[in-house]
């Protein structure tokens, strides 16, 4: 304890009590004490000046402490009696366990030689827990410190326990290269194959579950439901007869007699209070409702595309296209809205039943499943006819008295298919692209009843067939540009006025007929104002 305190204050050891501490036999005066202290410091500095000794690396305090603790070499070295001038050397510096308690030296890792390891292994095989006497004997024989022998035995016992628990030899490969049981025994090949099969099945089930989840998320997402745009409000407003079509030429099934009759009979406009369905018809159709000329065809678009994309006849064309097996084009038509109702029927039988019942939609056509929101309108209030049939009945109750042809009547097979431009809503375009007023002049109801917003459907069809016969002459501007002339028409079985014969009409389209209009005919090139 005393020398520890002296090491903490190295200059305090050279005070007046130095003689008592060292055990010096003679009383020392102040002069001798200072002289002794000077020699002690010089010797410590000399010991520290040796560049590669342990004491020089650790500082001179340990050397000074060792010289103070060891009283035997004190007088010859301190007083210079020996005259050799050799610095002090720690007597037990080779033993790290016997170092002075004040100096904390870091222990380096002990490198055992092969011979030392062999002897230690032999001793370990004899006894895993050697006593202190056996450890001391090993340390003396192997030129080691007893503490290092003790630590080696501790580490060797831990390694042995680990090897016994896992049966893992020193040269064994990685733990997962050869499958073993929990006790370390090798597994049977059948068990290995069974485990591999279970792992593959588990991975396959996980992959299938992930695929199903991604498909369900894709079908219920808004991007998976509507391919072109957001769903329209036709399901809420009841306008199920109007199904939008993309701008592509109609298939041959849409140009049949039934499609022509339905398109001609449904030419009445929608009610004024109902907004147009998005993407259904040309936007110019709605401002021109007040004129009897109808919509103007688009300048850069063929007239048959306008005819195919407007009117309830397009819905029948869509049903026929679905019955023919063609891909469904419209994502928010009535077929797609009503597709995933619980009874799933075949598409062909649905289309035939819908055509026979006069429906413009087939409720069971297959498409992407939709949620059940908004279906109650169609299930509770089925639409039995296109929306265009309701308007002529309300508008012509005091007019010409012509009732439209019933929807349930079979289509007339004798009526030839008119060119697509004549089956459209629009007027026949004149030479300058303006609507021709001869179309309005040939319709008796359009001039006789100015209050009606649109002419009756039946004269439209008869007029179209009559115009088709005149178009064969080649001198009518609009019929000549529309398409080739069809064969001459047969008498129509549907109710309506008798179509004017070619003998009663002049061959040219520009001259008005004498008795066709009840009122004065407007001049050429002007639209008829129906307001």
From Swiss-Prot:
Keyword vocabulary terms for this entry: Developmental protein, Differentiation, DNA-binding, Homeobox, Neurogenesis, Nucleus, Transcription, Transcription regulation
Keyword Transferase: no
Pfam (any one): Homeodomain
UniProt biased composition (Low complexity): 224-236, 255-268, 421-438, 504-519
Biased segments, Basic and acidic residues type: 191-201
Swiss-Prot/TrEMBL GO biological process terms: cartilage condensation; common myeloid progenitor cell proliferation; dorsal spinal cord development; olfactory bulb interneuron differentiation; pattern specification process; regulation of cell differentiation; regulation of gene expression
Top-level taxon of the source organism: Eukaryota
Subcellular location: Nucleus
GO cellular component, one term: chromatin
Known DNA-binding region: 105-164
Ranges in coiled-coil conformation: none
Comp. bias (Basic residues): 202-220
Molecular function as annotated in GO: DNA-binding transcription factor activity, RNA polymerase II-specific; sequence-specific double-stranded DNA binding
Region feature (Disordered): 87-107, 161-312, 324-344, 401-531
Similarity remark: Belongs to the paired homeobox family. Unc-4 subfamily.
UniProt-recorded name of the protein: Homeobox protein unc-4 homolog
